[in-house]
Amino acid sequence: MKVFSAVLIILFVCSMIIGINAVRIPVSCKHSGQCLKPCKDAGMRFGKCMNGKCDCTPK
């Protein structure tokens, strides 16, 4: 059980670090599939739609 808790904490910290590096680009969207190409064109690796704008995560 202690190992499981430690793994959860590590995953939580890693997800926060990745989320901090997200960059919002001025592209409107309705779903995350619309953000893939604009984020790749901006030099980012991943993209998702949040509050109607694309949030991109760097490589």
Curated annotation (Swiss-Prot):
Disulfide bridge partners, by residue number: C29-C49, C35-C54, C39-C56
Subcellular location: Secreted
Tissues with expression: Expressed by the venom gland.
Tree of life domain: Eukaryota
Signal peptide positions on this chain: 1-22
GO cellular component, one term: extracellular region
Region (Interaction with Ca(2+)-activated K(+) channels): 47-54
Family membership: Belongs to the short scorpion toxin superfamily. Potassium channel inhibitor family. Alpha-KTx 03 subfamily.
Task performed by this protein: Has also been shown to inhibit with high potency Kv1.3/KCNA3 and with low potency Kv1.1/KCNA1 and Kv1.2/KCNA2 voltage-gated potassium channels. Also binds and inhibits the molluscan calcium-activated potassium channels KCa (Kd=135 nM).
Comment, domains: Has the structural arrangement of an alpha-helix connected to antiparallel beta-sheets by disulfide bonds (CS-alpha/beta).
Official protein name in the record: Potassium channel toxin alpha-KTx 3.5
Species this chain originates from: Androctonus australis
